[in-house]
Amino acid sequence: TVTEPWMFRGSADLIRDAILLRYRFTPYLYSAEYNASKTGAPIMRALVYDFQDDPNVYEESFEFLFGRDILVANVIEEGAKTRKVYLPAGCKWYDWSDKMRCYEGGQTIEIPVTMASIPMFIREGAVIAMADNQLMTMEGDHTTDLHLIVAPKGTVTTTLYDDDGVTNDFK
């Protein structure tokens, strides 16, 4: 079955916005891909991958981690006005959509949603690199302006992977 954005005319604007957001995540995604190539850690993963000591994530099937630090809780129910989200224990979580409101992990919260929502929560201690300039393709465009989102937790380090996009000169 072919599923292209233009096949869903009523949702085309929402799909476009999601695609543009995905391109803004290119620096974060590229760094996660580099990490995956070195460690074998999946880029998109079940919560249990990182939170094995939290039994509440064992049965969670709709929330997932994007990279190590972004919890995504897609809106999957048509017409939903709220979404319950379990935030894994052991750290704090910052709500991407609510001015980085901080929540303690180990609890289920209920947040307002619309079809335009992509509920995302940033793990404390994360540094998320995003493109500030609008990218339209992964091949032809390059990040020229970088925006860092920091979810506080004392002193933290992160790795931002970048290369020329063409050669293996980085080795």
Segments (PLM) and residue ranges:
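Catalytic core of carbohydrate-active enzymes
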Residues: 1-171
